[in-house]
């Protein structure tokens, strides 16, 4: 069984985080391609990435301090 992932865009506005689910239950290549398209359309670049403690979420920081992307592994069950 292939792992599935969600793509989430987190935007900070006036110290409030707004989470937008962009894609759900997709293959990793599909999620990464969509994130790349969105970065290009917003003229952003990835400046660094980090992992959560369990390694199920990758956080991508962009050149805009108010926008990050998260790729989250979907857990079965």
Residue map of PLM features:
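Short, mixed-charge low-complexity intrinsically disordered segments
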Residues: 37-77
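Generic structural motif
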Residues: 10-12, 26, 77
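Short aromatic-glycine-(Arg/Gly/Cys) micro-motifs in beta-strand/loop hairpins
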Residues: 1-19
């Amino acid at each position: 069984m292939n792992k599935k992932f969600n793509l989430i865009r987190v935007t900070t506005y006036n110290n409030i985080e707004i989470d937008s689910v962009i894609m759900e239950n997709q293959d990793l290549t599909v999620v990464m391609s969509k994130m790349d398209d969105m970065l290009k359309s917003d003229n952003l670049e990835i400046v660094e990435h980090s992992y959560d403690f369990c390694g199920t979420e990758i956080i991508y920081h962009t050149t805009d301090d108010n926008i990050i992307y998260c790729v989250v592994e979907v857990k079965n069950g």
